[in-house]
Amino acid sequence: MFITFEGPDGSGKSTIIQKVYDYLIENNYDVIKTREPGGSPIAEKIRNLILDTENIKMGYRTEALLYAASRAQHVEETILPALNENKIVLCDRFLISSLAYQGVGRGLGIENVRNINEFAINGVFPDFVLFFDVDPITTLKRKSSLDTADRLEKEGNNFHERVYNGYKEILNSEKNIEIIDATQSVEDVFSQCIEVLKRRNVL
């Protein structure tokens, strides 16, 4: 079972994926938690290149291709082997993030970004997606400081609004999306996720 956690920066998905992972471990499920960009030694090196705040001259196409390259390695080295061992895979970001951030946020076009990423993942799609729905104004308020923000997190409000609107556009055409109200408390959001996992027969 392959489950991805998607949402804008500051939506709380990284906190919740850890709680879901801990819950599954405590209940003796065979599960791994991973992230994008990154998730394997080579993919993590690509992550560092993408998010380094010194790489301000990185072109948008370069950025999109690096995300796809990281994803290809991540699938081959981490995700697919785990799925072949019948493990539950929880992944913090996947394909839809690239469609929203590079396809819409960077203006490269959803279909252009989809094409390079579908080549990268080679047919390995999530069984379903948990989308953490919260508007960009709220997410920006949640960030205590930009001092530790990465290159994309440092983008202005207009960029993050485009990304959020991109997510909304993409969700209308994608299947197997579960909308999580991420404006609620951590415990309430966690409970929503557990209910989805039960309904989806993961638990």
Swiss-Prot record:
Keywords for this protein: ATP-binding, Kinase, Nucleotide biosynthesis, Nucleotide-binding, Transferase
Pfam families given in the database record: Thymidylate_kin
One GO MF term attached to the UniProt entry: dTMP kinase activity
Catalytic activity: dTMP + ATP = dTDP + ADP
InterPro entries the UniProt entry points to: P-loop_NTPase, Thymidylate_kin-like_dom, Thymidylate_kin_CS, Thymidylate_kinase
Any one of the GO BP annotations: dUDP biosynthetic process
GO cellular component: cytosol
UniProt-annotated binding residues for ATP: 7-14
Kinase listed as a keyword: yes
Entry EC no(s): 2.7.4.9
PANTHER family noted in UniProt: THYMIDYLATE KINASE, UMP-CMP KINASE 2, MITOCHONDRIAL
Protein family per UniProt: Belongs to the thymidylate kinase family.
Function according to Swiss-Prot or TrEMBL: Phosphorylation of dTMP to form dTDP in both de novo and salvage pathways of dTTP synthesis.
HAMAP family the UniProt entry points to: Thymidylate_kinase
Protein name: Thymidylate kinase
Species of origin: Finegoldia magna (strain ATCC 29328 / DSM 20472 / WAL 2508) (Peptostreptococcus magnus)
